[in-house]
Swiss-Prot record:
GO MF annotation terms: ATP binding; ATP hydrolysis activity; RNA binding; RNA helicase activity
Residue ranges occupied by any Helicase C-terminal domain in the UniProt entry: 624-778
Gene symbol of the encoding locus: RH33
Disordered as annotated region, ranges: 129-149, 282-302
Family: Belongs to the DEAD box helicase family.
Keyword set includes RNA-binding: yes
Gene3D superfamilies: P-loop containing nucleotide triphosphate hydrolases (3.40.50.300)
UniProt binding sites for ATP: A419, K420, T421, G422, T423, G424, K425, S426
InterPro entries reported in the protein's UniProt record: DEAD/DEAH_box_helicase_dom, Helicase_ATP-bd, Helicase_C-like, P-loop_NTPase, RNA_helicase_DEAD_Q_motif
Domain notes: The Q motif is unique to and characteristic of the DEAD box family of RNA helicases and controls ATP binding and hydrolysis.
Name of the featured protein: Putative DEAD-box ATP-dependent RNA helicase 33
Keywords: ATP-binding, Helicase, Hydrolase, Nucleotide-binding, RNA-binding
PANTHER family, alphabetized: RNA HELICASE
């Protein structure tokens, strides 16, 4: 009965304390003591139930312990574990590796010191030993004598010899120069007789009473008695000739005397040296305390010199190997030999030789014919079929650029060519390209599995690539089987592939982006480019700039190294010339047809500048256009704007004002750009509003006026824009329209003949007409122009530096184009431009 009453209590206690291991232990011990009151028979009856309870309880305990371990403990597997000092295992490992390296370096230093000590001991033994004591030397070598330098070097070399390797040691290894034995007397032979103090004192007093020779010499020696770290106390280099004593007496400048006085002082010094009475000297760490005494007979006419610092190292360690035995005799050089008189005539001749090709050719030519040379195309090594095509086009004479570059390019040399705009650069590299293709096709080395591409021409814009392709096809119209293809953006990728496979393509003209797309998409173009012979980069300063540099590098990696490379541009800054080493060989030619100190623009192009408030620019441009149209019946005008959307706004405004205008910018489709470009080439009385896509290389004939609204990106871009007029030696005008806060750009153009002119007075009727036309333009075009204008001037370093001022200028531009308030920017765009939180820049929520 009692047993039945106690069992429920035990079960309740188990459930209450089963969650902790401590409670389980207490429960187990208390239940074991509770059965002690029973009699032995009853206890035996209760043992089965007790055993059952113990087994269940033990299982519960083990399960609870396993659960406890799973929750509150973890294995030593993954996860960060720290070592002493808060280091992880990699830091701990690197620390011990560093300690091991330091320990190894210490051992090597100790071994090096032991080696140097052994070498010094060996040298002393050889230099001081008796030449006749062969038995004694043999005994020392048999017992514990020092190792020779050869033996020690061979022992060190054997440490690094792998097992099984051949021993390549020979007698030629080791010291190059033999030590001169017998040059020094033995240390045992030094006179060890007692010093005659009376003789020493009398001689000292005698010399001091005369001219203090001993005092000066003693002071000179004592000044050198202490040596710096790692220096020697050897006195071998301290003996000088007595004749030089007058020049070696900084402590006694009035020292002078006869030979007898010098002899008396020398005798005293000789006594001191022979008796070893220099006293004990204090040496620092790693200093040598060895004194090498010279013989009496050989040093009678010598004495100690305190200023002879020819040697500061130990002679015992290196002997005479660290001394230059023969001194260089300084000959007396006159001022005339050092600075010869300048020959004025020779300097003038050198300067005349360095004149540019431009100035030289101008002397030979007529004054009105500025770009053509006297050389004809039929005088050069050009194929007859190409000459026939040139004659059909009316081209007979070469330009100066073609005359200077054609011979170099036809010889297969790499060249970097700088020439003015509109001087025939395209023809200068197309003719060598055609000759390269003809030579490669006639050589017929091997049979190509795929049709090879022999010439690759890179251009920055689509219009320029299309223009060069048209010129190349005109030159190849009499050649059969030679084709010119273009790879430019704005066309279908699949159509480009089909055209390359179906039509002949020995000359490929491409823009970097589309060419890289074909290379990376494994269209088979890479294998065709492996037979490339000539690589041409037109407008190299732009293609090798930061914008195209990565794409050009990837393209160059796919081209063979054995090729000819040509780089052409009207402007070549120093940075671009450094980067040009990626394309050109080291021995390339640099052909500058402009010349140092010459103006990079054409002389026949009149350049002017108008500084006017930015709010009046959209009123001034129509006024300037109408004024030029009235003065020039056969006008052809190009208006350059900063961005594509500002170009679209300017085009829409001029169209609303009933002007004959066209537009080209990057936002337009390629078909539209090609049609407008061809129309502008063939027509007159037309106005082209464009962005920088038409600034480089485009040959628009008979352009009479170029207007640049706002500052260009840099000086080079201004020159390229202006180069659209005045081509082929003709005249033209260039006008730069800037705001007052853009005056800083004029400092970059100070070497150009830019004439400032005042802004014209605007009629109120013209202003009203412009305002009415601006009000008709869609708001979306204005907002896009505002965003593009803000992004452009934010990227310009001078204007984008001060964001608050930039916001004020943007608000002025906003009001000038007819917007009541500036349109909001996306938050992400504002953050990228650094305009978040700037007053006057609204953010779209």
């Amino acid at each position: 009965m009692a047993m039945a009453m106690r069992l429920p209590a035990i079960s309740r206690a188990v459930t209450e304390v089963a969650s902790s291991p401590v409670g389980l232990r207490r429960l187990f011990c208390s239940n074991a003591s509770r059965f002690s009151f029973l009699s032995p028979p009853a206890r035996r009856q209760a043992e089965p139930s007790t055993n059952l309870f113990h087994s269940g309880l033990s299982k519960r305990i083990t399960s609870e312990r396993s659960l406890w371990n799973r929750i509150f403990s973890r294995n030593m597997g993954g996860g960060p574990r720290t070592f002493p000092g808060g280091l992880n295992k990699w830091q701990w490992k690197r620390m011990h590796e560093k300690k091991a390296r330091e320990k190894e370096n210490k051992l090597l230093d100790q071994e090096k010191q032991l080696y140097e000590a052994r070498i010094r001991t060996e040298i002393r033994a050889k230099m001081w030993g008796h030449p006749d004591s062969g038995e004694k030397t043999a005994k020392l070598k048999q017992s514990h004598g020092p190792m020779s330098p050869k033996e020690h070097i061979k022992t060190l070399a054997d440490r690094f010899m792998k097992a099984g390797a051949d021993d390549l040691w020979n007698d030629n290894d080791g010291p190059v120069k033999k030590f001169d034995q017998g040059s020094r007397s033995c240390s045992d032979s030094i006179d060890s007789t007692p010093i005659d103090v009376r003789r020493l004192v009398s001689a000292t007093c005698d010399s001091m009473g005369k001219h203090r020779v001993l005092d000066s010499s003693r002071r000179g020696f004592s000044s050198m008695s202490r040596f710096k770290r790692n220096e020697s106390s050897c006195d071998e280099g301290d003996d000088v000739d007595a004749k030089k004593l007058d020049t070696l007496s900084p402590f006694s400048p009035k020292f002078s005397g006869t030979k007898e006085k010098v002899k008396s002082s020398t005798s005293v010094v000789g006594v001191i040296r022979n008796k070893g009475l220099f006293g004990r000297r204090k040496f620092r760490k790693n200093d040598s305390s060895t004194e090498e005494d010279s013989d009496e007979e050989g040093n009678e006419g010598k004495m100690i010199g305190w200023m002879d610092l020819r040697k500061t190292g130990s002679s015992a360690s290196l002997g005479n190997h660290d001394i230059k035995l023969t001194k260089r005799v300084n000959r007396n050089v006159t001022d005339e030999e050092l600075y010869p008189p300048l020959d004025i005539n020779r300097v003038r001749e050198d300067l005349s030789k360095k004149q540019s090709v431009d100035n030289v050719m101008e002397e030979k030519q007529e004054p009105h014919d500025s770009i053509y040379s006297a050389k004809r195309f039929d005088e050069s090594c050009i194929s007859p079929l190409t000459l026939k095509a040139l004659s059909a086009s009316g081209i007979v004479k070469m330009t100066r650029v073609q005359d200077a570059t054609l011979s170099e390019c036809l010889d297969g040399k790499d060249a970097l060519v700088k020439a003015k705009t509109g001087t025939g650069k395209s023809m200068a590299f197309l003719l060598p390209a055609i000759e390269t293709v003809l030579k490669a096709m006639n050589s017929g080395k091997g049979v190509h599995k795929v049709a090879p591409i022999f010439v690759l021409i890179l251009c920055p814009t689509r219009e320029l690539a299309s223009q060069i392709a048209a010129e190349g096809k005109a030159l190849l119209k009499n050649h059969d089987g030679i084709g010119v293809q273009t790879l430019i953006g704005g066309t279908r990728f699949r159509l480009d592939q089909q055209r390359l496979e179906s039509e002949p393509c020995q000359i490929l003209i491409a823009t970097p982006g589309r060419l890289l797309d074909h290379i990376e998409n494994k269209s088979g173009l890479t294998s065709r480019l492996m037979a490339l012979k000539l690589f041409i980069v037109d407008e190299a300063d732009l293609l090798l700039d930061l914008g195209f540099k990565r794409d050009v590098e990837k393209i160059i990696d796919c081209l063979p190294r054995q090729r000819q490379s040509l780089l052409f541009s009207a402007t070549i800054p120093k940075e671009v010339r450094r980067v040009s080493q990626l394309v050109l060989k080291r021995d390339h030619s640099y052909i500058d047809t402009i010349g140092l100190g010459c103006v990079e623009t054409h002389d026949k192009v009149k350049q002017s500048c108008i500084v006017a408030p930015h709010e009046s620019h959209f009123h001034l441009v129509p006024h300037l256009l109408k004024e030029h149209i009235n003065n020039m019946p056969d006008y052809k005008i190009i208006v350059f704007c900063s961005t594509g959307m500002v170009t679209s706004l300017m085009y829409t405004l001029l169209r609303e004002m009933k002007l004959n205008v066209r537009e080209i910018h990057a936002r337009k489709p390629q078909l539209h750009r090609t049609c407008v470009s061809d129309e502008f080439k063939e027509s007159n009385r037309l106005i082209l509003v464009t962005s920088d896509v038409s600034a480089r290389g485009m040959n628009y004939p008979d352009v009479t006026l170029v207007i640049q609204v706002g500052i260009p990106s840099d000086r080079e871009q201004y020159i390229h824009r202006l180069g659209r007029t005045g081509r082929e030696g003709k005249g033209g005008k260039g006008l730069l329209l800037i705001a007052p806060w853009e005056r800083y750009f004029l400092d970059e153009l100070k070497d150009l003949p830019l004439e400032p002119i005042p802004a014209p007075d605007l009629d109120s009727r013209v202003k009203h007409q412009v305002d009415q036309s601006m009000a008709k333009i869609d708001t979306s075009i204005k907002e896009a122009a505002y965003h593009a204008w803000l992004g452009y001037y934010n990227s310009v370093r001078e204007t984008g530096r001060d964001k608050t001022t930039l916001a004020e200028l943007a608000n002025r531009f906003c009001h000038s184009i007819g917007l009541e308030k500036p349109p909001a920017l996306f938050r992400r765009t504002a953050v990228k431009m650094g305009l978040k939180g700037i007053s006057g820049i609204p953010i779209r929520k």
